[in-house]
Amino acid sequence: MSTSVLPVAWRNPDAPHVLDNAAWAALTGPHARFAERVGHAARYPLDVSPFTALADPSDPRAWDDLAALVGPGTVTPVSGATVPPAGWETVRSGQGVQLVATALHSEPAPEAVRLGPGDVPEMLELIAETEPGPFLPRTVELGTYLGIRHRGRLIAMAGERLRPPGWTEISAVCTHPDHRGRGLATRLVRAVAAGIRERGDIPFLHTAAGNTTAIRLYESIGFTLSRRTESVRVRTPDRRQEQTAGPCRCDA
């Protein structure tokens, strides 16, 4: 068993940190091989992850690059942004929390099995049943995913998603409703964290701000609330409609 211990003041709240823009840091770092990028905007392939990120959400040039990347009239999520520029439509907004492993005991789970592409149909079925967050046909390529089976059926899983330099996000933590209350999710989180720490990274994770049950669980096993996060789902300006409409004529 190993323990991830960070000092109480593990970051300076007045200075930028790689986790402040984790998706961008991952797409321009360890996950650069997945990145579809135009200038200051990047995203994962649509069958890998829904994450879209901007180098600086306050920079209008980054939004122009995003429009070029995803195309006109396209709905896309944007991490770390709250209000899009004029001409963009906000479809939905959401708040989350980010937690960092400051005192997490990590250890392998002997009953856990490594999940791969051949397990994706079962993984997608479990995700649909439990709704822990986005998981797509190629999400399994982002890192290590572990699962626990009961009589051959996948009943719990957890794995790795974002990988900003020095950090790895634990994601897709879920247990089938018929098997909850047995500590399966906790064992898988510890096991995934053990692999993360073996390569020298620090585990972190995200959850919805309103998911107080999950937040309390993660805090109880050694995660500390790091920051609140914002995201928006936006529709890019449809320049095609503007071009079709043409200039307005106002004859007196």
Predicted regions and their residues:
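Conserved active-site alpha-helix within GNAT-family acetyltransferase domains
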Residues: 83-88, 186, 209-227
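Conserved hydrophobic beta-strand within the GNAT/NAT acetyltransferase core sheet
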Residues: 170, 203-207
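Short amphipathic alpha-helix that is part of the acyltransferase structural core
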Residues: 2-19, 102-133, 242-252
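Conserved acetyl-CoA-binding loop-helix of GNAT-fold acetyltransferases
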Residues: 61-66, 181-198, 215-220
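A short, internal acetyl-CoA/4′-phosphopantetheine-binding micro-motif in the GNAT/acyltransferase core
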Residues: 52-58, 173-180, 208
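A conserved beta-strand-loop-helix scaffold within acyl/acetyltransferase catalytic domains
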Residues: 134-144, 148-176
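N-terminal charged segments
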Residues: 1-84
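Conserved catalytic-core motifs of GNAT/GCN5-like acyltransferases
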Residues: 89-101, 206, 224-238
